[in-house]
Amino acid sequence: MYAVIKTGGKQYKVAAGEKLKIEQIPAEIGSEITLDQVLAVGESASLKLGDPLVNGAAVMATVVSQGRHDKVTIFKMRRRKHYQKHQGHRQNFTEILINTIKA
């Protein structure tokens, strides 16, 4: 069984037992969270689509860790004008383990 969930402005296809890095959620490590924005639920040949969400569907997950992604370097330059600008960014993430999918 799999589900398509929406969290942090992004959509993820998840199945039970998967580990997933999502946008940061303020939750303690080891705590159980419920992701209730489920867009679709599928099982082998059948697919249940929401309009926009599937009624009564939820995904239960456990927070495994909190962290930061690798640094992304931004470099801006204007040719012949002696303008150069360096900037870096590190995005926070939450790693979760999908426990169950309730449809």
UniProtKB/Swiss-Prot annotation:
GO terms for molecular function: rRNA binding; structural constituent of ribosome. One of its GO terms (cellular component) is ribosome. Belongs to the bacterial ribosomal protein bL21 family. The gene is rplU. The keyword Mitochondrion does not apply. This is Large ribosomal subunit protein bL21. Keywords: Ribonucleoprotein, Ribosomal protein, RNA-binding, rRNA-binding. The lineage of its organism: Bacteria, Pseudomonadati, Pseudomonadota, Betaproteobacteria, Burkholderiales. GO terms for biological process: translation. HAMAP family: Ribosomal_bL21 (MF_01363). Pfam families: Ribosomal_L21p.
